[in-house]
């Protein structure tokens, strides 16, 4: 990964936090976004910028210049509607690389049909490590 890589991570639960911290430890410039201000506050010292916002609002994303990121990771785990809307917003804004978390095969199919090329499925990742 080039030193100047700029990543946006949406959804700072356990999974999103681990992704953000791993990227930051490799020298990436990491910007985190979550609708929960406590989560943003908890990670702010470990990333370049932590913002509390509603990622389903494309205007809010534009104010944060998300379209200038090299890649975005949507790690929202419990609200698939928010995942879909955030992914669509990022695709519409022209973010070059959009990586989205899914919770199973049905969600993968939906995300693929929307044009998402990189889909993470934590459960499958764990299963492949164990087997």
Which stretches of residues belong to each language-model region?
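Cytosolic regulatory regions of ion transport systems
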Residues: 1-131
């Amino acid at each position: 990964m080039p030193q100047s890589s700029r990543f946006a991570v949406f959804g700072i639960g356990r999974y999103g936090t681990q992704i953000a911290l791993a990227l930051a430890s490799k020298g990436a410039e990491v910007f985190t976004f979550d609708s929960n201000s406590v989560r943003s506050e908890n990670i702010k010292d470990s990333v370049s910028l932590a913002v509390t916002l509603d990622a389903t609002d494309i205007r809010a994303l534009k104010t944060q210049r998300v379209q200038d990121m090299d890649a975005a990771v949507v790690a929202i785990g419990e609200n698939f509607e928010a995942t879909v809307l955030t992914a669509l917003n990022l695709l519409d804004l022209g973010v070059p690389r959009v990586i989205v978390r899914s919770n199973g095969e049905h969600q993968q199919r939906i995300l693929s049909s929307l044009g998402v090329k990189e889909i993470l499925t934590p459960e499958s990742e764990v299963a492949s490590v164990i087997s």
